[in-house]
Amino acid sequence: MDAGHVFVVDDEPTVLAALERMLRASGYEVSTFTSPSDFLAAAPHEGVGCVLLDLSMPDMSGLDVQDTMHRNGIAMPVIFLSAYGDVPSAARAMREGAIDFLVKPIGEAELLGAIRRALDTASAQERRRISRSEVEERLSRLTPRERQVCDLVIKGLLNKQIGSELGMTEKTVKVHRGQVMRKLEVHSVAALVRLFADLSDPS
């Protein structure tokens, strides 16, 4: 099975080459970039991957790359690499969600451990993304009327109350409610509520 995709962004070709050899030997798919802008143009918005990002580069700092990733909706976990221990930069990077901040020279075990943590995070993110996409696809099956009924069921209204709210008979509400449960592939109101809670969870 593919171990995961690691993107490496560093303006030093010798550093890139050394990291690429190490990572390929460990079974990872590797893409290297000396230009942050080239990485940002190529970075995927989905899939399981992480990025090793040099802190200090001439065209754009690693922190600026991280900010741009957030703005562009690139949720890939970031591991920062720095030639020196910059405490303020490390603190900012971690606040913005970096997995780790490593100071060169970096030991192989330390780096591979950070990459495993980053790819575990990426795998969890991808599972949530796929799950959310599946829920959104099911929701698209509902008619506007069924969606109205669904929203009121989630709010805890009884069939009679829903009928009064929407101007329909209780029997018609039951029909719509049954269609909602079938199309959303749930078998209880509790499961329906959980489905929407998962959809609204931004994590």
Residue map of PLM features:
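Short amphipathic alpha-helix used as the core "switch/output" element in two-component signaling
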Residues: 41, 63-76, 92
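Acidic catalytic/metal-coordinating carboxylates
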Residues: 34-35, 61-64
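Receiver (REC) domain active-site loop signature in two-component systems and cognate sites
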Residues: 57
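Basic, Lys/Arg-enriched C-terminal extension of HTH/homeodomain DNA-binding domains
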Residues: 181-203
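C-terminal output helix
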Residues: 86-88, 102, 106-115
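Active-site residues of response regulator receiver
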Residues: 54, 82
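Conserved acidic segment of CheY-like receiver
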Residues: 2-15, 19-23, 36, 51, ...
